[in-house]
Amino acid sequence: MSEQIDIGVLSESFNEFLSAEWPREKAVAYARGDATYAADLWAQVSALGWPALSVSEAMGGLGMGTQATAALHEAVGYAAAPLPLLGTMLAVALLEAAGSGAQKELLLSGLADGSTRACVSQPSDTPLNVDGQTLNGTVVDVLDAPVASMLFLRAERAGKAVWLAIPADAQGVSTERALLADTTRSIGSVALNNVSVDSVHILVPADPVALDNELLRLAAIALAADALGGGNAVLVATIEYLKIREQFGRVIGSFQALKHRVADHKAALEAARGLVEFAAGMESDSPQALLAALTAKQHVTRIAAEVARDCIQLHGGVGFTSEYVPHIYLKRAKLNEALFGTRSVLLDRIADMLEAA
């Protein structure tokens, strides 16, 4: 079976499972609460091996690669499922690239089976400073930090860039959840007060810049795929609503002006899919891999937010009420836009890359 067919089968299985286990009714009910993640759903997807998707086969994972993880994130975005998958995926990539044999042996199995939930600070964050064997400082806006059991944080030690793998329950570590409009995910700040650090906690990358770029590439593709899934989901929900909502004695979906708006959104999302698939299909060592990922992220997240925003309008007055799903997807789309570089930041980075080429 070809890789393309394998990815299609995987994507179908992801969507079938989430449509059964996380239907819209659950998404709406969850959005009204204050949970940090769906623990029962996480246990289910962990049993199915989803966190192990990008873990190498040599370390007990599935080794499926970026196309498979993009398909997974698209399905998660479609369902607006509150799962801390991105932090786990980035932690796997970080360990595979910079971890010692002992560190991989210690940490990858927990990431693969879902018993360890990870968060990874953004590559652009100011690094912490390791002073001897002690760590002090604060890292803000870390995705999945409130639910993580293992924290992966950028740092410097003796002037060299390193990453730290710190247990969330280590003495001196505290995490504070930040308020978010998007209730399907969590972000928090991590405070470290005289935290003891030894060699088992320190990951030393051979090429820190290349590693930062690879983490950014993977995050950009995942967020673009998530946005693509969310954009399609909110459009499908809106089309269903247009077919049943009546005004002036007719279903509003029969109005040509609304048909044109839906068609425009569908066309925009299909074009966005091409960007995601192109970026996910590139080899990580390709000179254009990061450029393709950043291009996809800045464009697709914007398109998804625009689609979700207009779908609220197409729903009319109920569009932003808690009983309907459009607001969930708009909030998720706006967070996707902001994570790992806003559109303006990424456009500046893209311009610099093109100028240097």
Could you say what each language-model-derived stretch is?
Residues 91, 114-116, 147-149, 160, ...:
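A generic structural signal for well-ordered coil/turn residues at beta-strand boundaries
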Residues 141-144, 167-204:
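Flexible, small-/acidic-enriched active-site or ligand-binding loops
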Residues 113-123:
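A short, Trp-centered hydrophobic/proline-enriched beta-strand micro-motif
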Residues 1-79, 114, 134, 214-357:
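Alpha-helical interface subdomain recognition
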Residues 82-101:
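N-terminal glycine-rich flavin-associated loop
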Residues 125-136:
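Cytochrome P450 C-terminal beta-domain/meander region
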